[in-house]
């Protein structure tokens, strides 16, 4: 996950056009999200220990490579960013929370610029095995390219994805002063909890509704200003409908005027990196004027019609 993070961060820094020699790196932070962190390291180290023979031992790099905040640390060390630096760990919301925290640190005047996003690398025996034991994964192994099918009546679980998404959030006047290429403005964020179950969402989407309402209030906009929603849409039987209930609950009748899609149908579920990757999808939807599709939704679940077109 830290390797994914470093590559995505390098792409973001390059795309930003920032001259690192002309900025105050004390005012540049890294706030990163990862739901699991170094799961591959954990797996390989425990396996090595168990098979270690007469004197089993763990590598001195075991802990530094495993903990989730090392991605933020690696990025800061590479570029000399000495501002706020930490990792948000909140399962599939990890990089969403990282972006909200980044927004607020800039608002508070604690940073001029923050490199934010998330990464995940959980396609390994414990990652796949653990989610499989929870019956969270699709079993459409005979047709994997159609396995991720949010809102389809035959959806049966998510497909694990791997990777990273990185964004540079920057104080507006600071960005203008250096002639930055500005893709969009981040105007608000909201956070909440269902307080319901440790894996299943609230059946009426109560936590999701609160997060969206708080984001709209924080942004100072009205629900009618929204014309696209990139939903979580993991392709699980339990998750997709409550989310649409939440969107409809927040937008009211305006929901019928809004484009809604799940890009997880194309990327799979990147777990803690999902929010950052999907934020990029939204940014490029704005940039190019194209709404990303929900592929594989061939037989729409009739229950979704109650909440959206």
Feature locations, PLM:
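Short glycine/threonine-rich loop-to-helix capping motif typified by GTGT followed
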Residues: 196-208, 234-251, 256, 270-277
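A glycine- and small-aliphatic-rich helix-loop capping segment at beta-alpha/alpha-beta transitions
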Residues: 40-55, 105-108, 128-141, 203-204, ...
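Active-site-proximal alpha-helical scaffold in enzymes
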Residues: 5-18, 71, 76-79, 84-120, ...
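Conserved beta-ketoacyl condensing-enzyme motif
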Residues: 1-90, 119-128, 225-239
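Conserved small-residue
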Residues: 9, 30, 75, 95, ...
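Glycine/charged-rich beta-loop-alpha catalytic/anionic-binding loops adjacent to active sites
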Residues: 50-61, 78-88, 145-153, 192-193, ...
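Condensing-enzyme catalytic core mediating Claisen C-C bond formation in acyl metabolism
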Residues: 142-219, 228, 294-297
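Conserved small/polar residues in nucleotide/adenosyl-binding loops
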Residues: 308-309
């Amino acid at each position: 996950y830290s390797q994914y993070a470093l590559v995505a961060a390098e792409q973001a820094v390059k795309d930003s056009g920032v001259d690192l020699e002309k900025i105050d790196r004390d005012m540049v932070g890294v706030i990163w999200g990862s739901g699991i962190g170094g799961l591959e390291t954990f797996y390989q180290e425990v396996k090595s220990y168990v098979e270690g023979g007469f004197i089993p031992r763990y590598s001195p790099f075991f802990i530094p490579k495993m903990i989730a905040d090392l991605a933020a640390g690696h990025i800061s060390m590479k570029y000399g960013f000495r501002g706020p630096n930490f990792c948000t760990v909140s399962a599939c919301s990890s990089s969403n929370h990282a972006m909200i925290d980044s927004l607020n640190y800039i608002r508070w005047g604690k940073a001029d610029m923050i490199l934010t996003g998330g990464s995940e690398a959980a396609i390994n025996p414990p990652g796949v095995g653990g989610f499989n034991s929870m019956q969270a994964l699709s079993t459409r192994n005979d047709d994997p390219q159609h396995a991720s099918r949010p809102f389809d009546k035959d959806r049966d679980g998510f497909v694990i994805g791997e990777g990273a998404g990185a964004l540079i959030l920057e104080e507006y006047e600071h960005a203008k002063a250096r002639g930055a290429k500005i893709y969009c403005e981040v105007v608000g964020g909201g956070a909440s909890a269902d307080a319901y179950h440790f894996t299943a969402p609230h059946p009426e989407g109560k936590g999701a509704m609160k997060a969206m309402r708080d984001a709209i209030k924080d942004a100072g906009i009205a629900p009618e200003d929204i014309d696209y929603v990139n939903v979580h849409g993991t392709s699980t039987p339990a998750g997709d409908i409550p989310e649409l209930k939440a969107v409809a609950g927040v937008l009211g009748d305006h929901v019928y005027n809004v484009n809604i899609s799940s890009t997880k149908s194309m990327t799979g579920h990147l777990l803690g990196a999902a929010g950052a990757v999907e934020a990029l999808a939204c940014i490029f939807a704005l940039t190019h004027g194209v709404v990303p599709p929900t592929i594989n939704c061939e037989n729409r679940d009739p229950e979704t019609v109650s909440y959206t077109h």
